[in-house]
């Protein structure tokens, strides 16, 4: 290899080089995004003006709405925007055909349509939500201006579809062709780094339980990563055929990771109790078996897991899993020599049953990750998709709020005949749609109003004091660029995103000239007054009409979280594990966002999630064990141990639907009865944990009992049940 010249080596050794690359990976990405926004916006505006489209600004606004730092997100938003625009335009033409001569009926039907679309956006909470948003406010944006001239409604819809299509084409072209940022690369990096953090978390947890705060923080991170990776997976199919061919394995990988975290949380909860019980000798007895896994994970902790690393990990885990049963028998013999009581023996068996299942899941995860290196693989076949869970009341509240806003503003417009009333109403429809899928629509609407007010001030200066003095498209770009740069910069900052969006979209709506520029200060001021008033009404409605960040929604989502146990008990077994895992985490992720700024509420929700996952997962394992029982009288449906498990299931359903001290007492009695019935039953197989069905059943029952009695669980706040509950 030829050595570099001395001056080049000197440049490479400078400290500024490291700082430059740090900047390029952080703020540099933002400035590349801003440059691409400018390029796409001005390309779209130039083409729209050259093609003499009626409203070139509509095409340019499309760029501001769909542009994202990563090209996959742009493709996804463009796809759903086009679908939403077509649906909204079709509905607008239908409403005009039905109610063109009756403004009141038209506004009522439009309000219902926008409400339904807003509810759909709140229910989906991904890029599909964007399709609902566009379907709602496209009908308003096209229908309201043409209400006075219904004969032009169809052509208005056609022109809008063409303008938006032009904006979508330019956005996707610029995003993919100029310094592209791939969502696929972001997803691969997230997958690689996620396992490194998890391996370190597990390795340290097997040696000694984590502190409560660190344990909760780590789990919140894993939940956010699972939800985020699912979002990335749904985006990468639009941009990367390499990832599209692995879509099933990526789905499977995320599902297996969620199961992994649940199994480790269950194991950690048991280890924490055993470690804190000074009188128990169980922790010392099981520790040698756990250290072997911790040592194997040490080599993968804190670094990315590549496909080759995953294959190596899978081989190590296969060897460890093969040697584990013999090691457990050896440790059990040594433990029995100490003459432990029944409760300690159950703890011993439960700990190794949980460990064995965790290793199985970890091995399966490693195999799936390693299979990503191949274009085709048998693990691609996966029919347990990620199943998001949304509260229907929260979605309905969003729809009711949107319909109410449109009815109020539309009625005001009809009653006053204000010339800018149509602008106020359609901008309110757009605002309520854009804010419907956010955790805090009040804040988003208010920020958009602030951005619009700022855009009005800047726009007035440019429209009446700058535009008359310029000539030609280059000078127009020159005077618009500072506003767009500032707006895009604000939009890239989460704390000021609403201000940036409002500035970009509504400065363009009211201040960017068409091919034939009309200078009318009266209309300009009235239109911007209508825009700001519509947004402020949206903000007020978001604060008053069923606000999503209020106590009622936290309580409802907490109830939905608890009812996931009911789903685990009564749901269809096929695909139940994945649906339970993803639905529970999705509910927690929503509730945690709605409860922002309320740490006590967030902590309570997180504790409920832990107990729901622990009990629900154990119930699903019990159901799976019973579904594959051998044909033998000892495992018949009529056996007392199976009947007692059904009774326990009904008791758990009552407890999690309506938590109370009496229901907790009944559930514990039912669990203890199921344990005693299983202990009293005989079976035809050797009593080893890898061959005995009843031993595995006992382990899961015992774990359910310890979860119900966990002092850190929210069930502990119900009060200590009366009586002496003991597994023996």
Q: What residues fall within each predicted segment?
A:
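Extended, charge-rich low-complexity regions and/or helical-solenoid scaffolds
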Residues: 546, 550, 572-663, 667
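A transmembrane helix-and-boundary motif of multi-pass membrane transporters/channels
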Residues: 1-241, 245-246, 364-375, 380-610, ...
